[in-house]
Amino acid sequence: MESTEQPRNISGSMQSPRSPSSHPYLSVSVTDPVKLGNGVQAYISYRVITKTNLPEYQGPEKIVIRRYSDFVWLRDRLFEKYKGIFIPPLPEKSAVEKFRFSAEFIEMRRAALDIFVNRIALHPELQQSEDLRTFLQADEETMDRFRFQETSIFKKPADLMQMFRDVQSKVSDAVLGKEKPVEETTADYEKLKHYIFELENHLTEAQKHAYRLVKRHRELGQSLLDFGKAVKLLGACEGEPTGKAFSDLGTKSELLSIKLQKEAQQVLMNFEEPLKDYVRYVQSIKATIAERGTAFKQHCELSETTKLKEINLDKLMLTRSDKVGEAEIEYREIKAESEEATRRFERIVKRMEDEIVRFQEQKTEEMGVAFHQFAKGQARLANSVADAWRSLLPKLEASYSV
């Protein structure tokens, strides 16, 4: 299946096909899902088509094959490297094995993966990522090697040391009675957290009701189909004109059943799925908030440790201790760590300030489109249903007026 999506420039607006090189653009399409393998080893592969005029890419178009775990690799790499940025969410795996390879699930996941990678490609910082270029251009063997290295426990010894330090710190806090967590309490930060947690609740509730709407449309469609068949059989037992009227009623019910099933699919893809996507997005933002909390804690703890080291150094200098040299080295090292932790925390805060504005603008636009499509679809369905039943009235009236 050939992609028909027009290139987008890096600000996210549509690029004119007549002047593809007038502005920098990076457009990605996730297409052609194919099931590979059997049993528990089975998975879906996708063609990822990249079109760009950015000089750091290998050419104007590149096609690679990717699987879900490759998208996970990209998300994890970006989350690790771009602290403070709201990394777009991935669609979740199917919790029910029998639905893993259903046509509906595969299409929903393909669409969600397409949204995921294009959000990254359109982000002013993320679109410059070396990992994104690797994901969009590397051959399958290279991609497998990167993914394997990422999952190896020996890949990140620094992470293991950090885990050890965290455990050591928690044990020390417990012994010293300092178990109360260090938390940021500024008014802006509290306002942000309140907004995100409230937004998650409201989106989750809206998505739950959208799911019920899809279910209701499908059930009503099935009921109309069953009713149409039953009325046709009933009409076959009747003479004219009643039999013909019943047959027309059954046919019309079956046609309306098809319309309801189609509308159910539209509500699912264009309304429920965008709501579900934004629930995942908010959960991704909560992960960034947690990272900010960790950075703030490190900033505070290292700042406190630096003060203690400075006090200890001053005492040793007063007593002319032979440990002054060693203490001075320790103080300089911990001070450098503290300053880096402060810069890291401040960078996260600044990024999040920019990100929340960007997120709200994006949410307003995308949710506005979703609600507009939903309302338009419901109006169209209501008109179709009313017209269908209205067209039957003269025939039904004639059947009992004879």
From Swiss-Prot:
Topology versus the membrane: Peripheral membrane protein
Composition skew (Polar residues), residue ranges: 1-10
**Residues where Phosphoserine is found:** S16
What Gene3D superfamilies has UniProt attached to this entry?
Arfaptin homology (AH) domain/BAR domain, Phox-like domain
Biased composition annotated in UniProt, kind: Low complexity: 11-24
Q: List locations, semicolon-separated.
A: Cytoplasm; Endosome membrane; Prevacuolar compartment membrane; Golgi apparatus, trans-Golgi network membrane
Molecular function (Gene Ontology), one example: phosphatidylinositol binding
Q: Name one GO biological process term.
A: positive gravitropism
Q: Which UniProt keywords apply?
A: Cytoplasm, Endosome, Golgi apparatus, Lipid-binding, Membrane, Phosphoprotein, Protein transport, Transport
Q: What is its main location?
A: cytoplasm
Q: Where is the BAR domain?
A: 160-402
Looking at the record, which segments are called Disordered?
Answer: 1-25
What does the UniProt function comment say about this protein? Answer: Plays a role in vesicular protein sorting. Acts at the crossroads between the secretory and endocytic pathways. Is involved in the endosome to vacuole protein transport via its interaction with the BLOS1/2 proteins and, as component of the membrane-associated retromer complex, is also involved in endosome-to-Golgi retrograde transport. Required for the auxin-carrier protein PIN2 sorting to the lytic vacuolar pathway and the trafficking of several plasma membrane proteins. Also involved in the efficient sorting of seed storage protein globulin 12S.
Note what the entry says on domains: The PX domain binds phosphatidylinositol 3-phosphate which is necessary for peripheral membrane localization.
To which protein family does this belong? Belongs to the sorting nexin family.
Q: By what name is this protein known?
A: Sorting nexin 1
**Which organism is the protein's source?**
Arabidopsis thaliana (Mouse-ear cress)
Highest lineage ranks of the organism? Eukaryota, Viridiplantae, Streptophyta, Embryophyta, Tracheophyta
